[in-house]
């Protein structure tokens, strides 16, 4: 990733989302088993910067059964984390959410998505810079696209953010699950420097914004 300023160089050396694969593999663990899912689950795909944080935020929502970190939006088939981290594949770090629409609506997922990151910074989230960290929503149906467009229009009209929303809205082509060491990385590595400096503050802020719509902890 490209560093934002010389003042951040030392800090980002230890707190970048793009750490070495070897370091992450050492912390890999199996995703926990959730309660049996109903047959009528729907799926939604979002990109909001480093997927370690995005995954953790989504998993806290009531009605969400599974969240898978992965890559989408680009042209490279079966990309690796190292390839996506170059910013040359066109893929974004994303999450694929399986949810019960009887419990949590697509609009609530949109609300959570915009609460979990800054949708006004182009190709950047916090210290992470590059197209792989862009804000994006990948729709599956014309109805979803219309809902996304209307929601963004509403947020811009209400000036919910200090700058216009730059979130990409695109049709989902193919989602590639990330390597196992990236799944539930936040929960397995609470003392990781990046988690403590970047992800945990974002998740705590998200929890306050989405109070009443989260699972019991």
Placement of each model-derived feature along the sequence:
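Flexible coil/turn and secondary-structure edge motifs
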Residues: 17-217
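Bacterial N-terminal signal peptides
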Residues: 5-15
């Amino acid at each position: 990733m490209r560093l934002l300023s010389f003042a951040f160089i030392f800090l980002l050396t230890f707190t970048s989302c793009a750490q070495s694969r070897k370091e992450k593999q050492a912390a890999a663990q199996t995703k926990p088993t959730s309660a049996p899912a109903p047959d009528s689950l729907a799926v939604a795909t979002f990109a909001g910067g480093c997927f370690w944080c995005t995954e953790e935020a989504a998993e806290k929502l009531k009605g969400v059964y599974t969240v898978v970190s992965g890559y989408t939006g680009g042209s490279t088939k079966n990309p690796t984390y190292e390839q996506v981290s170059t910013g040359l594949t066109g893929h974004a770090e994303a999450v694929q959410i399986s949810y019960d629409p009887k419990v949590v609506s697509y609009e609530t997922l949109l609300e959570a998505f915009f609460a979990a990151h800054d949708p006004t910074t182009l190709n950047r989230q916090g210290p992470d810079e590059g197209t792989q960290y862009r804000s994006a929503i990948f729709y599956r149906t014309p109805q979803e696209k219309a809902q996304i467009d209307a929601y963004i229009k509403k947020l811009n009209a209400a000036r919910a953010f200090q700058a216009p929303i730059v979130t990409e809205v695109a049709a989902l082509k193919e989602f590639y699950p990330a390597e196992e060491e990236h799944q539930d990385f936040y929960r397995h590595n609470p003392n990781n420097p990046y988690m403590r400096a970047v992800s945990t503050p974002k998740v705590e802020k998200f929890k306050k914004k989405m109070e009443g719509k989260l699972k019991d902890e």
